[in-house]
Amino acid sequence: MYTEVQRVKVIIEYVDWYRMQAPRLGGVKLHVLLTGELGHEFVGGRDSFIELLRRHHLMLPKKKARHTTDSNHVYFKYPNLTAGLMAQYPNHVWYADITYIWIEGDVLYLHLITDGYSHAVLGWCLSESLEAENTAKALEMAIRMAGGGNLCGTIHHSDRGVQYACQLYVSQLRENHIRISMTECYNPTDNAVAERMNGILKDEWIYHQAMFRNYEEAVFEIGAMIDFYNNVRPHMSIGNKKPMDVYQGERPGKNLWKKDR
């Protein structure tokens, strides 16, 4: 039989290990992970677990987010097909966005495509420029993940940036029978899934780490982050299930995410 001191020591060691993989993994998600590994009797309820983190100075400070886009171009801007729409199955709606990543002496651009049903990252590309060919690489990865071919049931939603509206990108969507949807104003909530994905990667990982030294290090670390996010980190919007499990067929749970958490 273990003592309370031993129980707390084990819990803190597990928290430290998970925080090494995801430096800003929050208390609620840690509770889900540790309960799955150690059992509810050992870990205790969520509130007592959060209090344990607080006592041992393991709670995380809140971070502020940032964002960018350029829609001053001559290409056709498609209407928003996602207003009021909830994704009903994997590959129903894909949300695309580009965010910047600082490295020593430079900036890189992370192109992402997230599945709206499972919240899994299906495609990504880290590049040294905002050229559309880099954005298209993330799309190619997502199409491969979805099995390729005819994706006529899929809606691709993005902001109105030139990378998403240009002929190179639009033709790739049309070749795979993917419907095109774009935001109609500059409200971040019009592409909330993508904005939330950016925030998770930055707030839970990137902002907490030392600045990446170069492109190669950034690619390696971000690849590891996305793998952890997809396959290990519980996601509150799908009932604390793992995004890739839900993408591959597991039924999502109730949305547990609230802004005040």
PLM features: residue spans?
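Basic, flexible linker segments flanking DNA-binding modules
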Residues: 1-90, 242-251
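Mobile-element integrase/transposase regions
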Residues: 47-112, 136-141, 145-146, 151-153, ...
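Short small-residue beta-strand/loop micro-motif enriched in glycine and branched aliphatics
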Residues: 120-124, 181-183, 207-209
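C-terminal domain-tail junction helix/linker
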Residues: 174-178, 200-261
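Mobile genetic element proteins and their domesticated derivatives, centered on retroelements
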Residues: 10, 15, 30, 49, ...
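Short amphipathic alpha-helical interaction patches enriched in hydrophobic/aromatic residues
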Residues: 15-19, 34, 38, 125, ...
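RNase H-like two-metal-ion nuclease catalytic core shared by retroviral integrases
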Residues: 9, 69-73, 158-160, 166-170, ...
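A short acidic/small-residue loop/turn micro-motif
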Residues: 115-116, 126-131
